[in-house]
Amino acid sequence: MFWLRFQVRGLENVPMSGGGLVLINHQSFLDPPLVALALQRPVSYLARDSLFRVPVIGWILRSTCVMAINRDAASTASIRMALQRMNDGFLVGLFPEGTRSNDGNVGEFKPGFISLIRRSNVPVYPVGIAGTHDAMPRGGVRFWPQKVRVVYGKQLCPDEVSRLSVKGNEDKLIAFVRSAVEACKDEAQAWRDGT
């Protein structure tokens, strides 16, 4: 991806081994490979099942450890597979917005990631990405040369994640995680803008 001026910060926040859940803002189809590329370790993503039926995209997804999930009814099989991957020492990447941003800003988080947090005992890492929306916006079929910045945040406080994972605290957990991802995205955007 030589046409992107791609830089990262915070790689030291994500260990080179051990399972974990990586929660990322979603701007473009470029996000999954770029986030994983810098980590230099496999990241298994969850993607909506309908993408697997798109000829070229489906082949790529099946070839790269992507797990299909039905967004209308998160299947227990997909959740079990993601939990198994994390328990086996892999990172599982998820875009809690559930779709790409229309304008590059962080959108509303869907609650689907909560079951993974509740049922796993792995670190949770927020990641923010800026610039991929301009490089390949939603609905775009062309790449545009852009500066892209990715910020890997520190592991979310396990005690706070555990406290907020209790039934009835879903809105607080979503707000806590969204705030951490948005802080990483804002840092990436400021770095990209040179401010």
Locate the predicted segments by residue.
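A short, glycine- and basic residue-enriched loop/turn
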Residues: 11, 27, 98-99
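Non-catalytic C-terminal accessory region of glycerolipid acyltransferases
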Residues: 77-195
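Short gly/ser/thr-rich secondary-structure transition/capping motifs
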Residues: 1-9, 132-135
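Secondary-structure boundary/capping positions in well-ordered alpha/beta enzyme cores
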Residues: 5-6, 42, 67, 89, ...
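Catalytic core of membrane glycerolipid acyltransferases/transacylases, capturing the structured
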Residues: 2, 14-73, 81
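A short beta-turn/loop motif at secondary-structure boundaries
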Residues: 12-15, 142-143
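A residue-level signal for beta-strand positions that form part of recognition/binding surfaces
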Residues: 5, 19, 147-149
